[in-house]
């Protein structure tokens, strides 16, 4: 599984002119599921995201997690994180999970974050979404359960 994690002061997702998920201070997490991913990948990613220390402590050092600051998480599915642009100029998405598997593991990831006590909002799986955010920092982190980066 891959994720782009952004520290935000606020974020929201709009589908067909309706806000389907919104948060204040916390993390916006774009999540892509690969064709070979398993629940173990979900567990690794949920643990990493929930414990990622990218919020500043009283000394201004990035030392606090989203849970430490009582922040919120907005999770948005994004299969395009598996876009392969090494050949040509049109991305190939053959490494992305098929929709049924992608949805199941995306929902498992959200469930695991909630089990960790986090307040989680979501986008809408397979919908065309407009994501509005205020990136705080900016701080943007890339995660990959295969540890490619």
Swiss-Prot record:
CDD domains named among the record's database cross-references: Dtyr_deacylase
Catalytic activity: glycyl-tRNA(Ala) + H2O = tRNA(Ala) + glycine + H(+); a D-aminoacyl-tRNA + H2O = a tRNA + a D-alpha-amino acid + H(+)
UniProt-annotated location(s): Cytoplasm
GO cellular component: cytoplasm
Alphabetical UniProt keywords: Cytoplasm, Hydrolase, RNA-binding, tRNA-binding
GO annotation terms (biological process): D-amino acid catabolic process
Superkingdom field: Bacteria
Main location: cytoplasm
Sequence motif Gly-cisPro motif, important for rejection of L-amino acids, location on chain: 137-138
Class in the EC hierarchy, top level: hydrolase
Enzyme Commission identifier(s): 3.1.1.96
InterPro entries: Daa-tRNA_deacyls_DTD, DTD-like_sf
Single Gene Ontology MF annotation: Ser(Gly)-tRNA(Ala) hydrolase activity
Family per record: Belongs to the DTD family.
Notes on the domains: A Gly-cisPro motif from one monomer fits into the active site of the other monomer to allow specific chiral rejection of L-amino acids.
Quaternary structure and interacting proteins, as annotated: Homodimer.
Physiological role: An aminoacyl-tRNA editing enzyme that deacylates mischarged D-aminoacyl-tRNAs. Also deacylates mischarged glycyl-tRNA(Ala), protecting cells against glycine mischarging by AlaRS. Acts via tRNA-based rather than protein-based catalysis; rejects L-amino acids rather than detecting D-amino acids in the active site. By recycling D-aminoacyl-tRNA to D-amino acids and free tRNA molecules, this enzyme counteracts the toxicity associated with the formation of D-aminoacyl-tRNA entities in vivo and helps enforce protein L-homochirality.
Name this protein carries in UniProt: D-aminoacyl-tRNA deacylase
Species the sequence originates in: Thermotoga sp. (strain RQ2)
Lineage summary: Bacteria, Thermotogati, Thermotogota, Thermotogae, Thermotogales
């Amino acid at each position: 599984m891959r994720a782009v994690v952004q520290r935000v002061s606020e974020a929201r997702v709009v589908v067909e002119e309706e806000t389907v998920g919104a948060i204040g201070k916390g993390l916006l997490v774009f999540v892509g599921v690969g064709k070979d991913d398993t629940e173990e990948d979900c567990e690794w990613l949920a643990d990493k995201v929930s414990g990622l220390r990218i919020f500043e402590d009283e000394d201004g050092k990035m030392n606090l997690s989203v849970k430490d600051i009582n922040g919120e998480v907005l999770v948005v599915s994004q299969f395009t994180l598996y876009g392969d642009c090494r050949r040509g100029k049109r991305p190939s998405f053959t490494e992305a999970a098929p929709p049924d598997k992608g949805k199941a593991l995306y929902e498992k990831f959200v469930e695991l974050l909630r089990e960790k006590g986090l307040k989680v909002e979501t986008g809408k799986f397979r919908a065309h979404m407009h994501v509005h955010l205020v990136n705080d920092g900016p701080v943007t982190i890339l995660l990959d359960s295969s540890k490619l980066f």
